[in-house]
């Protein structure tokens, strides 16, 4: 009996580590691909309220951990069509999230990046609703992500206007 419990805990631990690794991995690869463009970004005219550069990786790491935790709460919930749709939306928004910094930093397509960010915000909103329908806590964990994307949209749009 205890042995079964140990295997169960190991499976849940493996699931948790996996769902945390996915968004952190997306962020790490995206960050690696855009690191050469940070000098260009720092030379741009910045809108008011732009935080210092060190804030971005700290906030994104926290957001990736929260969204990974939210996806864990969904992944361990009973298998339903709602759960499947929510996890598909989660995967799609992660893919869209991955491409935004490439459009913004590497390509310098500020207006395109803003439109992409609006799409990302909408997908995250739908994902948050889908998560909240299954687990209220999972939905709550996604709210800071929506708030940050709203702020990122402000920064993105005004960088487009100012540059």
Where do the language-model regions lie?
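Membrane-helix boundary connector in multi-pass membrane proteins
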Residues: 104-107, 125-139
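Membrane-interface loop-to-helix entry segments
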Residues: 51-65, 108-119
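N-terminal membrane topogenic signal
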Residues: 6-20
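Membrane-interface helix caps and helix-loop-helix hairpins in membrane proteins
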Residues: 100-111, 159-163
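Membrane-interface helix termini and inter-helical loops of multi-pass transporters
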Residues: 35-49, 161-162
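Terminal transmembrane helical module of multi-pass membrane proteins
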Residues: 134-163
């Amino acid at each position: 009996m205890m042995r079964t419990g140990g295997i169960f805990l190991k499976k849940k631990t493996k699931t948790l580590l996996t769902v945390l690794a996915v968004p952190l991995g997306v962020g790490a690869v995206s960050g690696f691909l855009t690191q050469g463009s940070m000098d260009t970004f720092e030379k741009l005219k910045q809108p008011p309220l732009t935080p210092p550069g060190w804030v971005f990786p700290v906030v994104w790491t926290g957001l990736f951990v929260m969204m990974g935790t939210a996806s864990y709460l969904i992944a361990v919930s009973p298998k339903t069509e709602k759960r499947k749709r929510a996890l598909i939306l989660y995967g799609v928004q992660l893919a869209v999230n991955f491409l935004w910094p490439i459009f913004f930093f590497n390509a310098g397509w500020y207006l395109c990046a803003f439109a992409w960010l609006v799409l990302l915000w909408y997908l995250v909103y739908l994902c948050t609703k889908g998560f909240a329908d299954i687990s209220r806590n999972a939905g709550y964990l996604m709210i800071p992500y929506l708030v940050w994307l709203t702020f990122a949209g402000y920064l993105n749009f005004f960088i487009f206007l100012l540059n």
